[in-house]
């Protein structure tokens, strides 16, 4: 297994990796009885969770991640990228998920145009993306690396531990000429990434921090300083 994939998997299994999914699943709880496309499905954690009450198709280009996929509930898994979905009929899906993917894509517009084609009118596009303010806060407070934070402010891409360079982007600009309208956004990782990891193994930490994150995830200014932002867009 490639070292970066192993690091990513180990991080997900830590309390600070698990709570990300606790928060995300709470924000996706209204998705039931839908046909769902999870584009860039990774280890399949979100696809597997939603497959309990939905018909889910997952697409992931990394074969190592697919080999380690979670599949407690039945869903279809394809290995690939746009090549796997270009043959699908128009308006094939009620919901499309694209979580922490577009930072690593060269031509985001091409991907989003394809999502627009595949979504039914009124359908939901769920995008989780890095938030530049949250990036800088974590770098200064948790990592204590002011030079790296200054580099981020100057426009330098973020070097992630497992997935390489993550390039920030303006979602409003990317979708401005598409039939996609931002409905709302929520924060993920408002507080927990700013804490020292030694606190995160304490009994009850995950449960209490989840309550705190969910209490503010829909509120400004908290959602505006989160490391991740979860956008919901509607297909017009």
Predicted segments, located by residue:
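A C-terminal cap/extension of S-adenosyl-L-methionine-dependent methyltransferases
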Residues: 184-236
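Conserved class I S-adenosyl-L-methionine
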Residues: 1-32, 45-49, 65-68, 126-152, 196
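Class I SAM-dependent methyltransferase SAM/SAH-binding core
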Residues: 43-84
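A short acidic, Gly/Pro-enriched loop at the edge of an enzyme's catalytic core
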Residues: 86-95
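A short SAM/SAH-binding and catalytic strip from SAM-dependent methyltransferases
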Residues: 95-107
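Short alpha-helix
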Residues: 162-179, 185
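A short glycine-rich, Lys/Arg-flanked "PGG" loop and its adjoining helix->strand segment in the class I
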Residues: 109-124
């Amino acid at each position: 297994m490639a070292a970066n994939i192993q690091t990513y998997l180990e991080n997900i299994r830590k309390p600070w990796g698990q709570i990300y999914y606790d928060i995300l699943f709470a924000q996706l709880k209204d998705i039931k009885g839908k046909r769902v496309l999870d584009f860039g499905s990774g280890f399949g954690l979100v696809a597997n969770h939603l497959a309990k009450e939905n018909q889910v198709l997952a697409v992931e280009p990394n074969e190592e991640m697919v080999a380690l996929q979670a599949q407690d509930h039945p869903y279809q898994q394809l290995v690939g990228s746009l090549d796997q979905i270009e043959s699908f009929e128009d308006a094939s899906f009620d919901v499309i998920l694209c979580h922490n993917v577009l930072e690593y894509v060269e031509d985001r517009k091409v991907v989003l145009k394809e999502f627009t084609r595949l979504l039914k009118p009124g359908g939901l596009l769920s995008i989780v993306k890095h938030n530049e303010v949250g990036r800088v806060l974590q770098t200064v407070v948790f990592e204590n690396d002011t030079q790296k934070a200054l580099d981020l402010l100057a426009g330098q891409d973020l070097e992630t531990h497992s997935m390489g360079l993550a390039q920030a982007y303006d979602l409003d600009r990317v979708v401005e000429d598409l039939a996609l309208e931002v409905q709302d956004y929520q924060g993920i990782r408002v507080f927990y990434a700013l804490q020292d990891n030694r606190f995160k193994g304490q009994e009850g930490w995950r449960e209490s921090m989840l309550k705190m994150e969910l209490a503010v995830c829909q509120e400004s200014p908290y959602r505006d300083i989160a490391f991740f932002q979860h956008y919901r867009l509607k297909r017009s």
